[in-house]
Amino acid sequence: MKANLGNLMKQAQQMQENMKAMQEKLAAIEVEGQAGAGMVKVTMTCRYDVKRVNIDSSLIGDDKEMLEDLVAAAVNDAVRRVETVTQEKMASVAGGLGLPAGMKFPF
């Protein structure tokens, strides 16, 4: 019984270290969200830090409200992409846990 508990504690510690390492890797990964057929692009890290916003020069001076909507849509697209990449990367860390199919990680 003690051996099983000790083994479980070692596994938990190893997983914690693996998760920390993966979070550091995710911080370096950048994804790009787009809107308006690529006329507005937002680049952010998988820690949700926005690094760049690119707006096609043809949109400058156009309808301000439309431009604001496109920026918001590009940010939302980038957020969805971050979530997808994060889920894929964290799934490799959680692979040994035996979580039920479809369960998102981290919880």
Curated annotation (Swiss-Prot):
Q: What SUPFAM superfamilies is this protein classified in?
A: YbaB-like
Major subcellular site: cytoplasm
The UniProt GO MF terms for this protein read: DNA binding
An example of a Pfam family matching this protein is YbaB_DNA_bd
**Gene Ontology CC entries for this record:** bacterial nucleoid; cytosol
Superkingdom of origin: Bacteria
Q: Report the subcellular localization.
A: Cytoplasm, Nucleoid
Which keywords has UniProt assigned to this entry? Cytoplasm, DNA-binding
Q: How does it assemble?
A: Homodimer.
* UniProt function note: Binds to DNA and alters its conformation. May be involved in regulation of gene expression, nucleoid organization and DNA protection.
- Which family would the database say this protein is a member of? Belongs to the YbaB/EbfC family.
Protein name, entry field? Nucleoid-associated protein NE0434
Lineage per the UniProt record: Bacteria, Pseudomonadati, Pseudomonadota, Betaproteobacteria, Nitrosomonadales
